């Protein structure tokens, strides 16, 4: 039997450009990927979560027997959520869109579509990786400061070799 995990709380969090993931992830590839990623230095309070919605299931009954003879299932969405409590303008532009300099940020016009990979490292050393997440970010006042609540919804990678989600024990995330 493998190592028992709880995947409790968040210890580190990163995001980055989805084009950096070009093959099925391994611990070695993740180790190298993190070198290109942006680390989120502040997650406000206890806002980090990983949630999977319940699947929608439809059952079909045999009219003659009244018993289920087949079913159909649509899997629920997987989302990584967190609020950044302290950030710079570049981070705001990365996740909310728009243009940034060291001292200014300007909101983009129209609809903004942002995709990033997301990686969370839990307190019990489990890496959770979403290779392609649709990022929905906004401004929200939380505890008297304007934070950036982020919802990263897992979407199907464009590369068939890449899974929609990976988990790695930290013991395998190392250089070759």
List each language-model region with its residue ranges.
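Solvent-exposed edge beta-strands and adjacent loop segments
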Residues: 2-87, 131-145
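Mixed-charge, glycine-accented linear interaction segment located at domain edges/termini
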Residues: 124-176
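Short secondary-structure boundary segments
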Residues: 20-40, 98-105, 160-168, 174-175
């Amino acid at each position: 039997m493998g190592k028992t995990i709880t995947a409790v709380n968040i210890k580190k969090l990163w995001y980055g450009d989805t084009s950096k993931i070009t093959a099925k992830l391994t611990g070695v590839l993740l180790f190298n990927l993190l070198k290109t990623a942006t680390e989120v230095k502040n997650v406000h309070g206890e806002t980090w979560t990983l949630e999977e919605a319940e699947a929608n299931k439809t059952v079909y009954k045999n009219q003659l027997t009244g018993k289920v003879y087949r079913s159909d299932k649509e899997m629920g969405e997987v989302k990584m959520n967190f609020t950044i409590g302290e950030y710079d303008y570049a981070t705001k532009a990365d996740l909310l869109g728009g243009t940034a300099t060291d001292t200014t940020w300007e909101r983009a016009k129209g609809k903004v579509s942002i995709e990033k990979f997301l990686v969370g490292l839990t307190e019990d050393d489990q890496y959770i990786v979403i290779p392609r997440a649709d990022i929905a970010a906004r401004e929200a006042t939380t505890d008297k400061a304007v934070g950036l609540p982020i919802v990263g919804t897992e979407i199907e990678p464009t590369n068939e070799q890449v899974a929609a989600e990976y988990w790695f024990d930290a013991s395998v995330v190392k250089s070759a």
